[in-house]
C-alpha cells in the first residue's frame, strides 16, 4: 500500500495541508481528518476487531470494525471502502453516516495522541473476511446489544473512540436501527 497521509485541519475543520500518517501521530498530534466504521453482517451482528500488536497507537485493543484516514481528494465513504478492503479483505454496502460530527482527542498509554474530526459510518459486509494480520490480530461477530453492554460495563477494554461513539445516544440509536434492518 502506498504511503498514507492525514489531512490536517484548523479549529473550524477546514483543511490546511497534509502530513505523512506515522509522522502525524505523536505526543503532539495536530487536528486531522479520520473516519470510523461499524460493519454488520447479514445477521445484524457487529464486527469487533482487535488491533494488531504492531499498531503504533492502542495496539491489541478491541475496537469497532475499521478506522482510518481519507486521502486528499478522497471522500470519507471511499476511504471506508478502501480501508475495509485493505484491513479486512471485505466488500461492503455503501457506508451510511451515523455520527457525522464526531470529534475526539485521546492519549494512548505510550503517549501517542489521537486528535481527530472523525465521522462515523455503518455498512454491511457483502463478502467473506480475509484479515490482514498487520492490521487486525483477532475479530469476533457479536450482537450489538452485548457489545454496548460490554462498553458500558468495561470501557477500559475498548478503544476510547469506540467508547465515546457508543456514549452518544443518537449514534447508539442509529447503530441499533442499522443492526436490526437486515
UniProtKB/Swiss-Prot annotation:
Keywords: Cytoplasm, Isomerase, Isoprene biosynthesis, Magnesium, Manganese, Metal-binding. It catalyses: isopentenyl diphosphate = dimethylallyl diphosphate. InterPro entries: Idi_bact, IsopentenylPP_isomerase_typ1, NUDIX_hydrolase-like_dom_sf, NUDIX_hydrolase_dom. GO terms for molecular function: isopentenyl-diphosphate delta-isomerase activity; metal ion binding. It holds the Pfam family NUDIX. The active site is at residues 67, 116. GO terms for biological process: dimethylallyl diphosphate biosynthetic process; isoprenoid biosynthetic process. Residues 30-164 form the Nudix hydrolase domain. It is found in: Cytoplasm. NCBIfam families: IPP_isom_1, PRK03759.1. Belongs to the IPP isomerase type 1 family. Homodimer. This is Isopentenyl-diphosphate Delta-isomerase. It comes from Escherichia coli O9:H4 (strain HS). The gene is idi.
